[in-house]
Amino acid sequence: MKDTIPTAETASRRPEPAARGGRPRRRKLTFDRVTFFLAFLGVPLAIFVIFVLIPFGQAIFWGMTDWRGFSPDYNFVGFDNFTKMFQDDIFLKALRNVALLAAFVPLVTLTLALGVAVAITLGGPSKGPVRGIRGASFYRIISFFPYVVPAIIVGLIWAQMYDPNAGLLNGVLTGLGLDQFDTFAWLGEKAAAMPAVMFVIVWGLVGFYAVLFIAAIKGVPGELYEAAKIDGAGRFRTTISITLPAIRDSVQTAYIYLGIAALDAFVYVQAMVPNGGPDNSTLTISQRLFNVAFAKQQFGYATAMGVVLAAVTLVFAALVFLVNRLTGGGEGESKRKAPGSRARRAAAKGGAR
């Protein structure tokens, strides 16, 4: 065995000796480290405080007043606005509606987006290497197109399509022999209004998240799929055992963003059903807030609604993180339970042979 003589280069790569007690020594603050933290931590933190925390604190303050918006005069009323809010039947109906949207829209959208992404990325011929379907780029553009159209335009287009007298949807259904839909009011029937609104929101968002998942799936090592294919795993089994665990963080992030969009959903709903629908069946908190502020000029009360909506959004995000952690998510779990470990072993054996 050849003896090696330590050089300056190898010596510089040696780990620094630990301090007493086994603790590593603290690195000294240098100009480079200070400027790095100021640029990449201090500036974003300052922006967050100025544009998020301070306005939110102001919103809490104005939510405790009877401010009318167009006057400098106001009175401090404490928690009266919040008490009034939870005694307001219309607000409670709006709260139930957004809870329904947050429960179904993310679930349906992500399920469809995952299906589209897997089909485009891994749905190619079963023979040969694992690859996407032919014309994947075309299908990716087509699926993404609804997201490119502004939400207000999407809402107005679908409002015309849902029109009971001259709408395209009723015309198509009637042409197929379903005469009961001749003058059916999709946005005027209590039982149909909310599902119709949900469909439009899902239609407008599913393409974006499909493209997001396509990018995430392409980051999964190809040898995992090849090894799973050698093991005899089908497409469904491969998707459940390899693809989903590998893109779990992307799914979690998408679920949070979709939940926030569903809890708001102001643009889509306001474009299609500006009056809140039959018996307020499609009314959202954002719509109620808008009407209270600008129609009744109760800006203090409306601001209190905004504070509650922000709190509900934070609770939703926290629940998503909690569920993900309890079901095995998180960085630590991903290191202990790496997806496709069996496939990795199979690939390693194949390479050794």
Curated annotation (Swiss-Prot):
Tell me one GO biological process term. transmembrane transport
Alphabetically ordered keywords of this record: Cell membrane, Membrane, Sugar transport, Transmembrane, Transmembrane helix, Transport
Q: Its topology with respect to the membrane?
A: Multi-pass membrane protein
Q: Which InterPro entries match?
A: ABC_transporter_permease, MetI-like, MetI-like_sf
List, for all copies, the residue spans of the domain called ABC transmembrane type-1.
95-320
Record field: transmembrane: 36-56, 100-120, 141-161, 197-217, 254-274, 303-323
* A Pfam family per the record: BPD_transp_1
What is one term from the GO cellular component aspect held by the record? Answer: plasma membrane
Q: What induces or represses expression of this protein, per its UniProt record?
A: Constitutively expressed. Slightly induced by GlcNAc, (GlcNAc)2 and chitin. Repressed by DasR.
Q: Which CDD domains match?
A: TM_PBP2
Annotated region described as Disordered, given as residue ranges? 1-24, 329-353
Localization (cell): Cell membrane
- According to the UniProt entry, the coiled-coil residues are none
Q: Where is the composition biased (Basic residues)?
A: 337-353
The record's family statement is:
Belongs to the binding-protein-dependent transport system permease family.
The job of this chain, per UniProt, is described as:
Part of the ABC transporter complex NgcEFG-MsiK involved in N,N'-diacetylchitobiose ((GlcNAc)2) uptake. Responsible for the translocation of the substrate across the membrane.
Q: How does it assemble?
A: The complex is composed of two ATP-binding proteins (MsiK), two transmembrane proteins (NgcF and NgcG) and a solute-binding protein (NgcE).
Return the protein name.
Diacetylchitobiose uptake system permease protein NgcF
Organism, as annotated: Streptomyces coelicolor (strain ATCC BAA-471 / A3(2) / M145)
